């Protein structure tokens, strides 16, 4: 082997070897235990960022470790290739989304290869390819036939800039998450998939996901939002109209003082016909902040409709208001207001001088003070007629029963979850496979006409989707009749909801999935991705798997057994304020800093001499110009160093602070490993290790070796604390570097240790490990080598440190044989100077002995 560690040479050679040998290509093998490790597929934006590198390094470490355990490991990669950014980039660069996307895929694929990830590239897929999305279209038609797909006109969040629909989660502070334009409300026809039909199963099966983060499961439980309550019908006075509301607190029903409906409610529209002020208010509401998260903090506004409803149990007149905090998409689009016992209702009633009626006693049995806020705690009913004196539970049941008896209420289970709107009014997505015949009949595209191919040779004007602008594209013939194709495309979450299954059979052309391959590999054993996907992708991912199961394509209930959500990558952020008052962010690579004795930045300047303000560590982003290009780091230090730093600098699920000094430290460590291996191999072959001939020092070193193997195995396999695994290897390396190399057994032990170290490092630093394994004479290639096994016998201590106490106070520590008896330990303690002086002239009245740990002498 060469004396110097030169990653730029060895990494390209090793990568070429993997390519030529197709080292990571796998097929189904019933004779081997399978392991499917998957990182969330990237969007081909053009360049990898450090967040990608962290995600994929974690997945690769796990995959390589499991491979060394002898498993048949599938680790695929592909491209989530549809999506809005491609359209913007195409307009900006005067091209079409397809060539821009394919060029990015080629570039990023090369970047992934430079990082040495062990992917089965034969399974690579891009979701924008017709051979992929044809099966998504086919599946959609099957869901339609099963009654799980429908079309309805619905109020949506509309981004006027991007001209597309946004999910509620994509509306941040009333603005589009992508372009920051103010979001509007708009009624348009949309296709929906009935995820609500699976709400109970999606909720209950979270309990099966024992190896998913609790935080993700809690977020999904809250998003599904199951509640038990009563749906109640009010009659609008002087009309035949009925108004339905849902409440989880029927025990407070006698405290209703007003009803509130959404701006989009039919009753609101009816009331506005002869009320211009109300019509204006409704228009204002339609363009107000619309994300559900905004509801809690935005100003509550309302206007009386002039309509009244009759309280179903008392007959009292209850005014009907339009309120901006009621959403048409949630529940019935109307709510009953109990301002005495709901804070939002209290704030609204206080603002508009509406009655506030208490109907629940305070905990001490007194009437609650509602002058400053509502009393939201549950308690005993009062001011509620025949229901006075009932507890919360009894009141709930009694009022629900009374409403049911009168035919104006029924118990219901409600969900916060809404059906999945999958229509997007953009071009760069999979066409929705539905057609409309001349007579108005809507039907799925026949199977023999699939895929409905998205034309790729288009001109983008940045405003209208090319397939909407091209009237000819929509024209087709179905069953001999002229028909028009749907010109909306699928939400890109459709593609990313089933890609994991298609990886098991990416070239299968007889169906969506090859059942034999899918059921061999699925479910995914380890999924890796960011927690920001908890309530969108990860919920759709689980939903789609259940749809696949119920179509007979897979035989498991959940798509992934274990989930690891990696933390964000942070970097220093610097800026100076320009003459226009705006912040100009400067890349950390263009900044010179001065630090104090504690390493804190005290001064920063850029290459132009501008004095900079240090904004602290923040997520790497284009907006703060603090992204670090992985390719630059790989060229400077090598892929193994970047990978090692990524896994060492922080626990996988925590944020990682990018520090180039830490990268340099990882590089120095690899050089030390290389140097020790070089010095060892230069001395020639070693003899076999003779365990019986080892002296105490050699036994101690071997004990440390096998304890390290045990710890690293547990840290990677069970605990997934990769940083502590690397720390343990580093600690062992320090001991090996100091170990004597005078005798043949010294060198034989070093040979065993280095072969183990190289294998333990292999998941993290596969290129260097590949070369070092060969240089050390390891059998075969390291990619097929078994993980080192910790020998129990080697880890047994010859001697132990025992704490000696006199009357419960520590007086000394002694080293004794591991199998020493109480008498032997006591005799050895009596010889210890620090202990002996406390035993002079006293009587030992009691001895407390914990073998291998403690001797406590009680004297008097």
From Swiss-Prot:
E.C. no: 6.1.1.4
Claim: Flavoprotein is one of the keywords in the record: no
SUPFAM superfamilies tied to this protein: Anticodon-binding domain of a subclass of class I aminoacyl-tRNA synthetases, Nucleotidylyl transferase, ValRS/IleRS/LeuRS editing domain
Record carries keyword Cell division: no
Keywords from the named record: Aminoacyl-tRNA synthetase, ATP-binding, Cytoplasm, Ligase, Nucleotide-binding, Protein biosynthesis
Entry superkingdom: Bacteria
InterPro entries assigned: aa-tRNA-synth_I_CS (IPR001412), aa-tRNA-synth_Ia (IPR002300), Leu-tRNA-ligase (IPR002302), Leu_tRNA-synth_edit (IPR025709), M/V/L/I-tRNA-synth_anticd-bd (IPR013155), Methionyl/Leucyl_tRNA_Synth (IPR015413), Rossmann-like_a/b/a_fold (IPR014729), tRNAsynth_Ia_anticodon-bd (IPR009080)
Gene Ontology terms: biological process: leucyl-tRNA aminoacylation
Residue span of motif 'KMSKS' region: 619-623
This protein's GO CC annotations: cytosol
Motif range ('HIGH' region): 42-52
GO molecular function, one term: ATP binding
Catalytic activity: tRNA(Leu) + L-leucine + ATP = L-leucyl-tRNA(Leu) + AMP + diphosphate
Subcellular localization(s) per the UniProt record: Cytoplasm
Amino acids binding ATP: 622
Family: Belongs to the class-I aminoacyl-tRNA synthetase family.
NCBIfam families: leuS_bact
Protein's name in the database: Leucine--tRNA ligase
Species the sequence originates in: Erwinia tasmaniensis (strain DSM 17950 / CFBP 7177 / CIP 109463 / NCPPB 4357 / Et1/99)
High-level lineage: Bacteria, Pseudomonadati, Pseudomonadota, Gammaproteobacteria, Enterobacterales
Gene label: leuS
């Amino acid at each position: 082997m060469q004396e110097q560690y030169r990653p730029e040479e060895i990494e390209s050679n090793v990568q070429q070897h993997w390519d030529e040998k197709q080292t990571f290509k796998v097929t189904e093998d019933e004779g081997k235990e399978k392991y499917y490790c998957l990182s969330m597929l990237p969007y081909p934006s053009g360049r990898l960022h450090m967040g990608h590198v962290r995600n994929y390094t974690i997945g690769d470490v796990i995959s390589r470790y499991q491979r060394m355990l002898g498993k048949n490991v599938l680790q695929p990669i592909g491209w989530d290739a549809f999506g809005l950014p491609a359209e913007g980039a195409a307009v900006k660069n005067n091209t079409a989304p397809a060539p821009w996307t394919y060029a990015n895929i080629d570039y990023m694929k090369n970047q992934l290869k430079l990082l040495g990830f062990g992917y089965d590239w034969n399974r690579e897929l891009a979701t924008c390819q017709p051979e992929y999305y044809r099966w998504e279209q086919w599946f959609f038609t099957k869901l339609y036939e099963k009654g799980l797909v429908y079309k309805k006109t619905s109020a949506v969040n509309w981004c006027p800039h991007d001209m597309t629909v946004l999910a509620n989660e994509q509306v941040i502070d009333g603005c589009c998450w992508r372009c920051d334009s103010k979001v509007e409300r708009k009624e348009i026809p949309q296709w929906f998939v009935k995820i609500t039909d699976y709400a109970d199963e999606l909720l209950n099966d979270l309990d099966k996901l024992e190896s998913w983060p609790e935080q993700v499961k809690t977020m999904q439980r809250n998003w599904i939002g199951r509640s038990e309550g009563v749906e109640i019908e009010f009659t609008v006075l002087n009309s035949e109209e009925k108004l339905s509301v849902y409440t989880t607190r029927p025990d407070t029903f006698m405290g209703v003082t007003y009803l509130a409906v959404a701006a989009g409610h039919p009753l609101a529209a009816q009331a506005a016909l002869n009320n211009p002020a109300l019509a204006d208010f409704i228009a204002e509401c339609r363009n107000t902040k619309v994300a559900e998260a905004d509801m809690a903090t935005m100003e509550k506004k309302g206007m009386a409709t002039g309509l009244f409803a009759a309280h179903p149990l008392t007959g009292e007149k209850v005014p009907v208001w339009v309120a901006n905090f009621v959403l048409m998409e949630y529940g019935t689009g109307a709510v009953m207001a109990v301002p005495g016992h709901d804070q939002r209702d209290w704030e609204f009633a206080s603002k508009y001088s509406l009655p506030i009626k208490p109907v629940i006693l305070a905990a001490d049995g007194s009437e609650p003070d509602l002058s400053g806020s509502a009393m939201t705690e549950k308690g005993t009913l009062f001011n509620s007629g025949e229901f006075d004196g009932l507890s919360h539970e009894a009141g709930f049941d009694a009022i629900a029963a009374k409403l049911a008896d009168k035919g104006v209420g029924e118990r219901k289970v409600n969900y916060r979850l809404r059906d999945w709107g999958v229509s997007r009014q953009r071009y760069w997505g999979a066409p929705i496979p539905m057609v409309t015949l001349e007579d108005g009949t809507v039907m799925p595209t026949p199977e023999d006409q699939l895929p409905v191919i998205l034309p790729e040779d288009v001109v983008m004007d940045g405003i209208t989707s090319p397939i909407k602008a091209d009237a000819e594209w929509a024209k087709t013939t179905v069953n001999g009749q002229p028909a028009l194709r749907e010109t909306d495309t699928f939400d890109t979450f459709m593609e990313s909801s089933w890609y994991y299954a298609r990886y098991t059979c990416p070239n299968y052309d007889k169906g969506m999935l090859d059942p034999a391959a899918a059921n061999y590999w699925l479910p995914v054993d380890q999924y890796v991705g960011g927690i920001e996907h908890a309530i969108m992708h990860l919920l759709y991912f689980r939903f789609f798997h259940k749809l696949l199961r119920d179509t007979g394509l897979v035989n498991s209930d959940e798509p992934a057994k274990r989930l690891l959500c990696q933390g964000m990558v942070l970097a220093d952020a610097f800026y100076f304020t320009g003459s226009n008052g705006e912040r100009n962010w400067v890349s950390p690579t263009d900044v010179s800093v001065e630090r104090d004795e504690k390493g804190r930045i005290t001064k920063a300047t850029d290459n132009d001499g501008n004095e900079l303000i240090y904004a602290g560590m923040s997520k790497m982003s284009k907006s703060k110009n603090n992204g670090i290009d992985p390719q630059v780091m790989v060229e400077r230090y090598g892929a193994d160093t970047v990978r090692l730093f990524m896994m060492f600098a922080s626990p996988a699920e925590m944020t990682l602070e990018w520090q180039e000094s830490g990268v340099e430290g990882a590089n120095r460590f690899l050089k030390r490993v290389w140097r020790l291996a070089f010095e060892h191999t230069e001395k020639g072959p070693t003899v076999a290790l003779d365990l019986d001939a080892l002296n105490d020092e050699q036994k101690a070193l071997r004990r440390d070796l096998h304890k390290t193997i045990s710890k690293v195995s547990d840290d990677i396999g069970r605990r997934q604390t990769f940083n502590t695994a690397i720390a343990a290897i580093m600690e062992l390396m320090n001991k090996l570097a100091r170990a004597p190399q005078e005798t043949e057994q010294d060198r034989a032990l070093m040979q065993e240790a280095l072969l183990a170290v190289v294998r333990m490092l292999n998941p993290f630093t596969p290129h260097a490990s590949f070369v070092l394994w060969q240089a050390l004479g390891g059998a075969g290639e390291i990619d097929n080598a078994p993980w080192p096994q910790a020998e129990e016998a080697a880890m047994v201590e010859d001697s132990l440190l025992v704490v000696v106490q006199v009357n419960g106070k520590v007086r000394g520590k002694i080293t004794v044989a591991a199998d020493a008896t109480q008498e032997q330990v006591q005799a050895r303690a009596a010889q210890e100077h620090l202990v002996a002086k406390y035993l002079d002239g006293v009587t030992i009245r009691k001895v407390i002995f914990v073998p291998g740990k403690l001797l406590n002498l009680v004297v008097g």
